[in-house]
């Protein structure tokens, strides 16, 4: 592992430690581009009662605000723990090109800090997942077409 990776992973771990000391969950994340830290985040679920307030999500939001764009192409994310499926999806949608994490799901499992079961559930077809997921078509096909027209007017 390079010194750069080590430095940013240690920063994510320090954020997690500081967050834990303040009563939060032990997760921190750092968004980096070109060797520069764009943003950091910690898990704020307990403080905000927001189940999406994961460290990676907070860091992605802050980086996007700083750049004035949701496009985080060329960025790397360093996380203290194995990113959950929600965070992985957000990083992919934002264009993050690289993710490194310090602690695995296996290391977190004995402490209730693993999302391996969620990954396993999501790997199943919708009909076999633990959540009831249904496609319920509605008679309003114009919604997406209207959005596309609005985007074309902006261009």
Predicted features and spans:
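Residues that line or immediately flank small-molecule/substrate-binding pockets and catalytic motifs
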Residues: 45, 79, 103
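Short, basic and Ser/Thr-rich N-terminal targeting/leader segments
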Residues: 23-27, 73
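Small-residue (primarily alanine) positions within well-ordered alpha-helices
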Residues: 12, 16-19, 29, 55, ...
């Amino acid at each position: 592992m390079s010194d750069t990776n080590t430095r940013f992973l240690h920063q994510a771990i320090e954020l997690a430690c500081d967050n834990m000391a303040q009563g939060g969950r032990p997760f921190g994340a750092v968004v980096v581009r070109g060797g520069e830290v764009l943003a950091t985040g910690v898990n704020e679920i307990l403080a905000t009662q927001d189940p999406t307030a994961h460290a990676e999500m907070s860091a992605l939001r802050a980086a996007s605000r700083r750049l004035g764009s949701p496009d985080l192409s060329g960025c790397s994310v360093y996380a203290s723990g194995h990113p959950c499926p929600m965070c992985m999806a957000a990083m992919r949608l934002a264009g993050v090109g690289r993710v490194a994490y310090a602690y695995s799901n296996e290391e977190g499992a004995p402490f209730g800090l693993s999302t391996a079961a969620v990954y396993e559930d999501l790997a199943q077809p919708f009909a076999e997942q633990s959540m009831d997921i249904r496609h319920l078509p509605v008679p309003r096909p114009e919604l997406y077409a209207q959005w596309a027209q609005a985007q074309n007017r902006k261009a």
